[in-house]
């Protein structure tokens, strides 16, 4: 599992930062990539990374401001042009379906893969399978905006091979049956319960990715005990009132959410273009005064998510 930040700026592109898009690489977990937001030129940013459009399985949109969605039509079309055939699902607030369908229709763009668009109308679970569970809550922004909590389900423990070998059980079909938790009988009449030969499960990881938001309780709830919290930090602490007026957060407020939620790690993004060059490091300094395990994303930077 790895983050690739494709765009980390706020509002409009700047020389140093493109607008919002984050790829969550789940190559080891499911051989796919999930994308969170898709600002303009996202597909161009992808060209500079290991992200492959054909592997994008899901796109989660936080809200419908242009800096978070204007890259969608181009990416969806290019994925088809480049030979993508596997299904893709886009999740987002009400209106995302109309935006995509009109853009593709007017531009006569035809996608050759199954494209499903899911409009989120209620908080709660938006996706779940045997590996992951994705929950959402409304944040505090000028328009409807969602934050996402991605929960990796616990992974079954490894088969205790050494223990079986000590008992004289040879590798083969019995190993698979025992790993599946079956009760088996050996040739000598010994009964083995597969559950007794499975190590402890690996705890799944929790990732929280928030859209644009003021400091709010929903952010803390989504980030509770997260392994990684990705939070916007549009403004410095001295501009807290301006952040409030424009429905955004300061770096210090992001750190406060991480601290209250007992998150393990904080990554700041959505940085205003007023912080050019190394001036953005002041945002990092302010956040670390409150929450030491803070990093700030820059375009094309990757962050592995360890177990």
UniProtKB/Swiss-Prot annotation:
Gene3D superfamilies: Ribonuclease Z/Hydroxyacylglutathione hydrolase-like. The active site is at residue 67. Its cofactor is Zn(2+). Zn(2+) 2 binds at residues 67-68, 212, 270. One of its GO terms (molecular function) is 3'-tRNA processing endoribonuclease activity. It is an enzyme of class 3 (hydrolase). Keywords: Endonuclease, Hydrolase, Metal-binding, Nuclease, tRNA processing, Zinc. The keyword Metal-binding applies. Signal peptide: none annotated. Binds 2 Zn(2+) ions. It catalyses: Endonucleolytic cleavage of RNA, removing extra 3' nucleotides from tRNA precursor, generating 3' termini of tRNAs. A 3'-hydroxy group is left at the tRNA terminus and a 5'-phosphoryl group is left at the trailer molecule. Zn(2+) 1 binds at residues 63, 65, 141, 212. The keyword Metal-binding applies. CDD domains: RNaseZ_ZiPD-like_MBL-fold. Its EC number is 3.1.26.11. Zinc phosphodiesterase, which displays some tRNA 3'-processing endonuclease activity. Probably involved in tRNA maturation, by removing a 3'-trailer from precursor tRNA. Homodimer. NCBIfam families: PRK00055.1-1, PRK00055.1-3, RNase_Z. PANTHER family: ZINC PHOSPHODIESTERASE ELAC PROTEIN 1. Belongs to the RNase Z family. This is Ribonuclease Z. It comes from Bacillus cereus (strain ZK / E33L).
């Amino acid at each position: 599992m790895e983050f690739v930040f494709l765009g980390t700026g706020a509002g409009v592109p700047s020389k140093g930062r493109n607008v919002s898009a984050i790829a969550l690489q789940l190559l080891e977990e499911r051989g796919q990539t999930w994308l969170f937001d898709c600002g303009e030129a996202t597909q161009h940013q992808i060209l500079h990374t290991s992200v492959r459009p054909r592997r994008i399985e899901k796109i989660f949109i936080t809200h419908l401001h242009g800096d978070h969605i204007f890259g969608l039509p181009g990416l969806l079309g290019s994925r088809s042009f480049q030979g993508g055939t596997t299904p893709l699902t886009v999740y987002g607030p009400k209106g995302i379906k109309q935006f995509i369908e009109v853009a593709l229709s007017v531009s006569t763009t035809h996608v050759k893969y199954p494209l499903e668009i899911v409009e989120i109308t209620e908080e709660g679970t938006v996706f779940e399978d045997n590996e992951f569970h994705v929950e959402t809550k409304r944040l505090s922004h000028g328009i409807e905006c969602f934050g996402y909590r991605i929960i990796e389900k616990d992974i079954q423990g490894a088969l205790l091979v050494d223990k079986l070998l000590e008992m004289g059980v040879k590798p083969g079909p019995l190993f698979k049956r025992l790993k599946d938790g079956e009760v088996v009988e050996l040739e000598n009449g010994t009964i083995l319960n597969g559950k007794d030969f499975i190590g402890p499960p690996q705890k799944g990881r929790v990732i929280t990715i928030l859209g644009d938001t003021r400091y709010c309780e929903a952010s803390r709830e989504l980030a509770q005990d997260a392994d990684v919290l990705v939070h916007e930090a549009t403004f410095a602490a001295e501009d807290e009132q301006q952040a409030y007026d424009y429905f955004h957060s300061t770096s210090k407020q992001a750190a406060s959410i991480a601290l209250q939620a007992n998150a393990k790690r904080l990554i700041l993004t959505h940085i205003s273009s007023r912080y050019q060059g190394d001036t953005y490091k002041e945002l990092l300094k302010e956040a670390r005064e409150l929450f030491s395990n803070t990093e700030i994303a820059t375009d094309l930077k990757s962050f592995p998510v360890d177990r």
